[in-house]
């Protein structure tokens, strides 16, 4: 094959998917860089890298027992910002704004440990594939044994229990019961 010939992909890839793949590696690199430096009493909850309008935002979500303060976010920003400048090669294709903040009421539950700690809480679960034609469940997390989430959710006016394999879960976050 001549090096001048175009490469034809068998499967078309949307630009959004390419950006998502690139963002995943940026998130992984940032997570590996900042995790060792976020020490107790703080806990790294999540790292997000998204485009908002024409701006790129790198969000570092941090929490601690009793919640974080504005002073905490300022102190953490002063630790994290210089660390990001040391990453070589620079993983960021564009300039970005660094945001260090609390995960808020609808904090993501990224680990098995965070799910175990959330038993008894009201959560929102998004699945890779639907279970009984439902792809998003919102309800009380009754149990989590490391492999299966048991959720009590409302289907119209009836309470139902669903067991969801952990491998089927795309995203989980705390939810606010209205």
From Swiss-Prot:
Domain of life: Bacteria
Signal peptide stretch: none
GO cellular component, as recorded: cytosol
Short name of any one Pfam family annotated for the protein: RimP_N
Primary localization: cytoplasm
GO biological-process terms attached to the record: ribosomal small subunit assembly; translation
Keywords assigned: Cytoplasm, Ribosome biogenesis
CDD domains listed in its UniProt record: YlxS_C
Subcellular location: Cytoplasm
Family: Belongs to the RimP family.
Described function: Required for maturation of 30S ribosomal subunits.
Name under which the protein is recorded: Ribosome maturation factor RimP
Organism of derivation: Streptococcus pyogenes serotype M18 (strain MGAS8232)
């Amino acid at each position: 094959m001549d090096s001048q010939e175009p490469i034809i992909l068998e499967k078309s890839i949307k630009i959004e998917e390419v950006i998502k793949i690139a963002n995943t590696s940026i998130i992984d690199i940032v997570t590996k860089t900042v995790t060792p430096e976020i020490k107790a009493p703080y806990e790294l909850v999540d790292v997000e890298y998204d485009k908002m309008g024409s701006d790129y935002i790198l969000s570092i979500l941090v929490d601690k027992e009793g919640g974080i303060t504005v002073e905490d976010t300022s102190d953490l920003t002063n630790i994290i910002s210089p660390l990001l400048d040391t990453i070589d090669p620079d993983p960021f294709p564009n300039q970005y704004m660094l945001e260090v903040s609390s995960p808020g009421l609808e904090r993501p539950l990224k680990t098995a440990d965070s799910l175990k700690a959330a038993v008894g809480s009201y959560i929102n679960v998004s699945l890779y594939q639907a279970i009984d034609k439902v792809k998003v469940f919102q309800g009380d997390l009754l149990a989590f044994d490391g492999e299966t989430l048991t959720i009590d959710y409302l289907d119209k006016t009836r309470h139902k229990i669903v067991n969801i394999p952990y491998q089927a879960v795309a995203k989980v976050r705390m939810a606010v019961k209205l």
